Every structure is written in C-alpha cells, then in structure tokens.
C-alpha cells in the first residue's frame, strides 16, 4: 500500500501552489492517471450503491466557483479505468452506479481521442449485474444528441438527468460566465421532454447572485413554474474569497437572498406535489434501502425508484414489505404522493412494469 501511494504521488500530483494577495493558495493538479488501478477505492455508500467519479477538476471557470483554482482543469479517466472499477464493484454486489464529475457531459473531451460520455455508457451497460446507471452534473453545453440517444434507448440507464442550470436570466448567466443562454437551455429541456416523455429532470439553482434584480428573480420563478422540474435544489449565493463574483458590485443582501430562496422552494414544493400526485396509479421498481418500525410492530420499507437519486430526492414508502431486505428490487404500485415522497404497495403478482 505504501509503495502504491508513493507511486501515485510521483506519477499523478503536481504542486501548483501560488501566491494570491497575501495568501498562499495550495493547488495540486493530477495528471489523467487511473487512481482505481493504483489503490482500489472502497465506497462508503451502502453495499448495493456506489458513486463513480469519472473525472476530476473543472474547465468552466464560473465566476462564483473556486473549484478550478484548487482542483485544476478537468481531467477525465479513461473508459477502461471506469469500466474496471464498475466491474469490480458489480462483482461485489453493487447494483446502482451514480456517475459524477464537476461537468459530466464534458467527460472525455479533454483526452482528444474520441472519448465521450455516450461511449463510456455504451461500455458500462454491457457489464453483468449492473441494474441502474444514473447521471449527475450534466452541464447543458455538451449535452448532445449521441448522449440523449443512449439515455433513451438503454434500459440500464435511468431516465433521469441532473442538469445544474444555476439561473435562467441571460444577464445573470453572463455575469456567472455560464456558457449557455436562456434560449439554449429552454431548447434542450424541450428536446429532453419530447424525446423521452417520462424522463426525470433535476436541476440546481442559485438565488442572490451579485446584480440579480427583482426582475431576474421573477424570470427564474416564472421559468420553474413553466418547466415544472421533477426535482430541484436551490441555494443562496455565498461569496468565495478570490473569485471574480466576490469582487462584483451590487452584492445582494442576505435578507433578500433568503426571501428569494424560500419563495423559490415554496413554488417548487407545489410543483413536486403535483408531479408526485400524477404518479398515483403507476407501477414502478423500487430499490429497498431501509426497513422502518412504527413502534407497534408494523413494518414499512423505505426505498427509491429509478427517478429518485440517493440523498437529494424523495423516497418511496412501501407498506407491508414482507420479507424485503435492503438492496432488494421490488415492483410497487404508487397509491399516494406528497411534496417529496411517495406511498406504494408491493406488487406480489407479475404484472410487469
């Protein structure tokens, strides 16, 4: 192990620390090496689920983000490296694989050898025992037709996309140094819904970015009400020392940030409840994660459908779980829906999904 660590340091880490003002910024860039082959990663997630990091660093340069300063430009793992890790974990019982990077849709383009996220997925779906593959952090800029096609047609790939949009106002997007316009974002979302009608779209939005006007915020609010995202996270802008956004004029007050955040989340709660109530009567497959006891001897299984990501989305609760255990996949019939969670009953006969 010690030899592997030393070898990894020698091969992969370059100290690029520098002085910024009166502070020393510690930045370590890693070459596109394959950490999995050097030291096999041990997931801290449940034994049936794992996160797979397909790249490190980021090349986007958003004005509010410090990641490129400390992690360097994006460096993708090779397809064989990722396939090797997924094969190993699937042989150990992992069934759900969540692919992550700072910008997953850009994956492979830095390698300049034809590698893309779609081509990686084509290899991952061939692996035995892989049940669900879910995609996170898909920036809209590089979300191309090849990627959409494989998401649509491959059964193992969850019909779920996480696209962190941050905002919809063009003036805010420009100050953020985002590469997409409101028009291109809306065009992509329309294409996703038209191509895959049952796709789940999750996004993350920011309120209170420097210079965000009341009109900008109202545009954002109108946007989410029109699109009706299946899942949405939001946060208030927080200045990161040393980033361009921290030096911008027209910083928004904390009070306004909080008010906008709560208004946005309240609107999304109504949208989520409406979306979930539309699922009543639908049959779906659920990954059981936990068995709950109400204290009176009544058990309930807590799990997730393929359209619910771990930790950030809601859950499905199944009454009378019988012999179900964490890690089991079970067919369930949705009987009720709330703002974030669903209630279902187990399907004991083979009705298909």
Tell where the protein language model's regions lie, with residue ranges.
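Short flexible coil/turn linkers enriched for glycine and charged/polar residues
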Residues: 44-48, 58-60, 157, 167, ...
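Radical SAM enzyme [4Fe-4S]-AdoMet core and its adjacent flexible, acidic
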Residues: 108-129, 175-179, 239-270
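Terminal RNA-binding accessory module
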Residues: 247-353
């Amino acid at each position: 192990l010690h030899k592997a660590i030393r070898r990894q340091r020698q091969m992969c880490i370059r100290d690029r620390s520098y002085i910024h003002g009166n502070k020393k910024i510690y930045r370590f860039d890693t070459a596109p090496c394959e950490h999995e082959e050097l030291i096999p990663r041990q997931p801290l997630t449940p034994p049936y689920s794992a996160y797979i990091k397909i790249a490190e660093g980021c090349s986007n340069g958003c004005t509010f983000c410090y990641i490129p300063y400390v992690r360097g430009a994006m460096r993708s793992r090779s397809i064989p490296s990722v396939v090797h890790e997924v094969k190993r974990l699937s042989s150990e019982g992992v069934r759900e694989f969540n692919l992550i990077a700072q910008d997953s849709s850009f994956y492979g383009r830095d390698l300049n050898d034809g590698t893309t996220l779609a081509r990686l997925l084509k290899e991952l779906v061939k692996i035995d025992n892989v049940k669900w593959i879910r995609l996170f952090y898909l920036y809209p800029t590089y979300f191309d037709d090849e990627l959409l096609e494989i998401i649509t047609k491959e059964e193992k790939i969850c019909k779920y996309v996480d696209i962190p949009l941050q905002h919809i106002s063009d003036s805010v997007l420009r100050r953020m140094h985002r590469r997409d316009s409101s028009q291109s974002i809306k065009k992509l979302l329309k294409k996703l819904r038209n191509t895959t009608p049952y796709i789940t779209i999750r996004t993350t939005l920011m309120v209170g970015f420097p210079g965000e006007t009341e009109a900008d915020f109202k545009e954002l609010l109108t946007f989410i009400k029109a699109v009706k995202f299946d899942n949405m996270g939001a946060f208030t802008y927080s200045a990161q020392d040393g980033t361009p956004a921290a030096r911008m004029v027209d910083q928004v007050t904390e009070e306004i940030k909080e008010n906008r955040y709560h208004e946005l989340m309240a609107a999304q709660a109504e949208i989520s409840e409406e979306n979930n109530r539309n699922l009543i009567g639908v049959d779906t497959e659920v990954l059981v994660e936990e068995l709950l006891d109400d204290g009176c001897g009544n058990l309930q299984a807590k799990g997730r459908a393929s359209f619910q990501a771990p930790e950030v989305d809601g859950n499905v609760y199944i009454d009378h779980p019988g012999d179900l255990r964490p890690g089991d996949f079970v067919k369930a019939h949705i009987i009720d829906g709330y703002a974030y969670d669903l209630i279902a009953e187990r399907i004991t006969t083979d009705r298909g999904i």
